[in-house]
């Protein structure tokens, strides 16, 4: 690769970025720009500092049932929760949940319970229309920790203090 950003052994149209088409595909560009910024804001995704003060593990795997990592032939989704001590607010924890529905139809998903004083806020839902994928500013709170994920979609939720 010699320092370039191309996919391994794919120096062809599969891995080329045609920046002249950025305006045509502005929604995709804005989505990935948002996700890169999101990753930089939440250090627990890439830089675990150990268990959260609430004793949740740094990374936990979930099926459509929270805290269950049992997978069967008909399991349709996977959830990953990151938990850790906040570097921004001393004494507080951060929680980030990624859910991926690989099935073609809707799947009911239960997110993990959070410590007292936290609730899940939906930041991203790719099952929505393109203009409604990024939800951070819309205050979509999952009070009952459940969401009906659209087929072949991804959600990102953040545990926030209330």
Model regions and ranges:
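Carbohydrate-interacting/catalytic domains
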Residues: 1-162
């Amino acid at each position: 690769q010699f320092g370039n950003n191309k996919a391994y052994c794919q120096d062809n149209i599969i891995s080329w970025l045609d920046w002249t088409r950025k305006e045509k595909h502005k929604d995709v560009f804005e989505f990935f720009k948002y996700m890169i910024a999101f990753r930089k804001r939440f250090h627990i995704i890439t830089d675990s500092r150990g268990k959260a003060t609430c004793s949740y593990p740094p990374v936990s795997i979930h099926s459509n049932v929270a805290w269950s990592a049992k997978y069967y032939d008909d399991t349709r989704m996977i959830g990953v929760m990151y938990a850790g001590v906040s570097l921004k607010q001393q004494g507080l924890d951060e929680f980030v949940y990624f859910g991926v529905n690989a099935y073609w139809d809707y799947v009911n998903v239960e997110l993990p319970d959070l410590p007292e004083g936290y609730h899940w806020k939906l930041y991203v839902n790719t099952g929505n229309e393109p203009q409604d994928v990024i939800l951070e500013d819309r205050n979509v709170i999952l009070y009952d920790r459940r969401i009906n994920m659209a087929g072949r979609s991804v959600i990102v939720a953040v545990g926030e203090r209330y």
